[in-house]
Amino acid sequence: MTMRILCLLMSLFISSSLLAEKSEKLPIKFALKFGMVKGKMSILDKFKLVKELGYDGIEVNAPSGSREEFKAASEATGLPIHGVVCSTHWKLLLSHPEAATRAKGVAGFEQAIRDAHFYGASSVLLVPGKVNKDTTYEEAWKRSIPEIRKALPLAKELNIQIGLENVWNDFLKTPEGTLKYINELDSPLVGSYFDIGNTVRYNDPSTWPSVLGNKIFKLDVKEYKRQPEGGNVWKGFKVKIGAGDNDWPAVCRELKKVNYSGWATAEVGGGDKKRLAEILTNMRKAFSH
């Protein structure tokens, strides 16, 4: 009788543990990019709208000509600017063949770090380089690493994380390659700004967390639908979050395994109040697994 009761209790414990594991949601804070908020409104009114809709934060470009307005709007509404996106990393590539261009890129990157600190943000999103007709994969690697290192003392001084985003730049397209690059920079302040939708065309997003682990600093959120052979691959981003080929339950499961918690920022086509509300609803559903 005692053994029966013991077995029953153990069975109930295991069942409840599995149920709790299944129902536990990722501790996510939801944000969007400032440029997604459309309409003829002041910066302050846009911050008010985002706050009203229930977003936890917002991300802005830096350097920016609206620096003071962004900070004032954040303070007035209580909506935190959790991070900034380096606004110079495409025009002034850190992998550019010309040293003068790379130097300008570093200057823009360092200003983004200063702006992040000014806002009370914790990170700068950075695209580290690009492979093109002028730059091979190996050259992009060898040129960009030293340039990023130049900004690391400032990042350390101001305690700003550098999140390297995986984008369609033909560079760092796998989690293994991304981790190797991060490890070569050898700084606790350098990690991955993991863009979930950007990987779907190349590989399964759910395979990234197990490789990168705690090097995933933040998440960019978009959806993607794989296109037929010969089709316009950019059309794949037209689908709403949750309506594409991304396996959100698998992504959530893998993020839980590495104990991810923190920011998930939408990077999709924005719009008016109704559209922004829809995006937040779709994100919450995607991360509910």
For each predicted feature, which ranges?
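N-terminal pre-domain/capping segments
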Residues: 2-5, 19-117, 156, 187, ...
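Bacterial N-terminal signal peptides
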Residues: 7-16
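Active-site acidic/histidine proton-transfer and metal-coordination neighborhood
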Residues: 22-24, 95-191, 249
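Acidic-and-aromatic substrate-binding clefts and catalytic sites of carbohydrate-active enzymes
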Residues: 37-42, 57-70, 93-94, 132-135, ...
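Acidic/histidine-rich catalytic cores of soluble enzymes
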Residues: 51, 76, 84, 149-245
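Residues at the N-termini of beta-strands
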Residues: 57, 123, 218, 262-263
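Conserved beta-strand positions
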Residues: 58-60, 126, 164, 194, ...
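Short acidic/histidine-rich active-site segments
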Residues: 263-269
